[in-house]
Amino acid sequence: MRAFRALRRCTQAKNIYPDFTLTPSGLQYKDFREGSGASPRKGQRVIVDWDGYTAGYYGRPFEARNKAKGGAFTGDNKEYLRWILGSGELIGAFDEAVAGMKPGGIRRIIVSPGPLFYPLDNPRRLGPKPSTFSGERALYFVLENQGLIDKTLLFDIELIRVENA
């Protein structure tokens, strides 16, 4: 049991970034562009563009919109991520981050294992999920790894628009 607790501590982030805002839930965020209009409310459909990186494990991208993916130049076909805010379809960090944004805004978030993270017992259960096989391999290698690697993730999120569901 002691070894399990030690493993848990090693998979959690050790860094609080001073130029990021830290929320009571543990989410760290930094706004690059504020956007305009009203912030989305629970129950509304949100449409976002996002990038994801394994910040705690060599900074490897696992989702990069508008960039070459796996050697294929497929950035022209944009499929945005859509979900109902507060529905539980995605990790809690996405709901919390987007709820505080305005359309057109860009926010960077740092997410560590905890209540806002992918479930460690079944990380494939919640999104966001990479759109490519190589992206899935990069993300799930980190999330499903039983070793002592830092599972911290970094996401860049752009709120494209908000719609009534």
Question: Which positions does each model-derived feature cover?
Answer:
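Cross-family detector of peptidyl-prolyl cis-trans isomerase
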Residues: 1-165
